[in-house]
A protein has these predicted regions:
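N-terminal membrane topogenesis motif
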Residues: 1-27, 83, 87, 240-267, ...
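Interfacial/gating helices of multi-pass transporter permease domains
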Residues: 36-56, 123, 195-203, 249-256, ...
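Interfacial segments at transmembrane-helix termini and the short loops linking adjacent helices
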Residues: 112-131, 359-389
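Membrane-interface junctions at transmembrane-helix termini in multi-pass inner-membrane proteins
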Residues: 138-161, 387-417
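Membrane-proximal transmembrane or re-entrant/amphipathic helices at the cytosolic face
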Residues: 489-551
Length: 551
């Protein structure tokens, strides 16, 4: 396969997963609107706290499984070892079931200590307990998704992801409504209506997560069983196949998982550390429990929810780049490796810059449109933290790139350095400058920036890739700034004419997309060859030619 075909294929597969991630995030964003209306900022605090605890145990138990499985499957498929691929699948399913069960037991028995003593959010225990069985389901589902990604097809993962989120959305809102009402009655009896209503409502929200995971697992299982009937016939035609022992596969699986596990744990535990440090220091500084809960509820329920939508594109592209890079790296195709790294970084920067600028410019209108929140605090957080979209998009992608070229320890080392410095900055901002929740926003963005710099150095060192600056960063950045001006002016004009925030916001976003695309092409930020690598690239090229934007 040529470099061009290789990078095109992996970008198309990555785009499929990215589109599924975007759709899933949009569904997630949409259902968070009625969910927030039901449980409020305090309920969002309990909900967010429960998820941070759940996420850490998910990361430790099975988050790295899809990546590890896709790496091993991709490497063996590139060598034609299908019987070994089947063994990898069986071993990974056993591994996922065991690790998920252990994590579920830990969460069940330690939930009270973690929520009350460490996180200072005792009422989140109801939501945490609901999430316990989900750890087992997600572990097995992750293995299946990793298997398909290793085969080079993202469609089963993409469809299961969307189905999972649809079920999640429906059940979350319904269960939150029902349990919030029940919590109100319980709270009335116990003399604490507000906290118990929010706590039970948050538990209802987490019930949707487990239900969605079960739906995703059922779909993935159906596709896997259908595929294996064909795959087993292909295995029979494989002659003189060298098959690794089960003990060896478990060993390799474990060796592959550990570095990924360490890097993802360190990379993602900054969120739970942020909450713990913020709440403990804010408590020592004399802020009321209600204020702390409100601030953190806005941060986790609104700010993080919005910021994570564009970052999910980078996560999807990172997931798709690992098996493609592993296959190229295993076969010694250095030029193909560098080509795919270049394609992935350029694609993600073209998306991240306008998302960051747009989110910053339209912070207040978006919050009013989605959450009916016109508070200065929420808007300021989004304006100040929008730049982290660029940082986390690039750092998330570069983690995947390093793992794809078998430099598993580099993200671990880089994440550890960034985490230590990030915690230091957070403590200084909280104590010396008393920035309360803004300190978390600044420190979080700083963590993403450090990961970008450190990972970029590692990618260059181990792949020989030299980063091009002008077309990758400067032109998308300038195009996004021009777009930002157009978005601001068009919003003000539409608001003046129609006096309706929803119309003005949607109109300004539409104008922003057009302006960004036009300026990007006029500044030669994308070539015709690069556009052709995108899904529906030929149609985009024809449109650009008709508008005389390509020569």
């Amino acid at each position: 396969m040529s470099n061009k075909k290789s990078s095109t294929s992996f970008l198309v597969q990555g785009s499929i997963l990215a589109m599924a991630s975007i759709i899933s995030r949009i569904i997630g964003l949409v259902y968070r609107i009625p969910l927030t209306a039901i449980i409020g900022n305090k309920g969002n605090d309990y909900y967010g706290c429960a998820f941070e605890i759940y996420n850490i145990l998910l990361i430790i138990s099975s988050y790295s499984l899809p990546l590890a499985v896709s790496k091993l499957v991709s490497a063996d498929m590139s060598l034609g070892r299908k019987k070994n691929v089947y063994r990898i699948l069986k071993c990974a399913l056993i591994f996922g079931l065991v690790s998920g069960t252990i994590a579920a037991l830990i969460l069940f028995f330690w939930a009270e200590f973690i929520t009350g003593t460490i996180m200072k959010t005792p009422y989140s225990i109801f939501a945490v307990k609901v999430l316990v069985p989900t750890l087992i389901v997600v572990a097995v589902l992750g293995v299946m998704r990793g298997f398909f990604q290793g085969l080079g097809t993202m469609m089963p993962s993409a469809v299961s992801q969307i189905l999972e989120q649809i079920a999640n959305a429906i059940v979350s809102v319904w269960a939150a409504y029902v349990l919030y009402s029940y919590g109100t009655k319980v709270g009335a009896v116990l003399g604490n209506t507000e906290n118990y209503a929010a706590a039970y409502g948050a538990a209802g929200g987490t019930l949707g997560t487990g239900t969605g995971a079960v739906v995703g697992l059922l779909f993935a299982s159906f596709v896997l069983l259908a595929y294996l009937s064909v795959f087993k016939r292909q295995m029979k035609r494989e002659r003189r196949a060298k098959v690794d022992s089960y003990s060896y596969i478990f060993k390799i699986l474990f060796i592959t998982i550990i570095p990924v596990l360490m890097s993802t744990t360190i990379y993602n535990c900054n969120a739970i550390l942020d909450q713990a440090i913020f709440k403990n220091i804010a408590n020592l500084q004399g802020y009321s429990a209600n204020d702390i809960s409100e601030w953190n509820g806005i941060y986790t329920g609104k700010y993080k929810t919005l910021i994570n939508v564009p970052i999910s594109i980078a996560s999807a592209l990172a997931a798709s780049s690992v098996p493609a890079l592993t296959a190229a790296y295993t076969n010694g195709k250095k030029e193909a490796v560098r080509s795919q790294i270049n394609t992935a970084i350029r694609f993600i920067m073209v998306v991240a810059f306008p998302c960051a600028v747009g989110m910053g410019v339209l912070a207040s209108p978006i919050l009013q449109l989605l959450f009916r929140d016109s508070s200065e605090l929420a808007a300021s957080m989004l304006q100040l933290g929008a730049v982290s979209i660029v940082f986390f998009s690039l750092s998330t992608l570069s983690n995947g790139l390093l793992q794809g070229i078998n430099r598993m320890r580099e993200p671990v080392k880089n994440a550890l350095i960034a985490l230590v410095l990030h915690i230091g900055l957070l403590v200084v901002l909280m104590y010396a400058f008393q920035l309360n929740i803004y300190a978390v926003v600044y420190a979080n963005a700083f963590f993403g920036l450090l990961m970008c710099v450190l990972n970029a150095h590692s990618v260059k060192k181990y792949s020989g890739y030299r980063q091009e600056i002008r077309r990758t960063f400067v032109i998308p950045g300038i195009s996004a700034l021009i777009m930002g001006v157009a978005v601001y002016l068009s919003y003000q004009l539409a608001l003046y004419l129609f006096r309706v925030n929803a119309i003005a916001t949607v109109f300004s976003i539409f104008i922003g997309v057009i302006v960004y695309a036009v300026v990007l092409l006029l500044l030669k930020g994308l070539t015709e060859e690069e556009i052709l690598k995108f899904p529906k690239g030929a149609a985009l090229v024809r449109l650009a030619r008709k508008m005389h934007l390509l020569r």
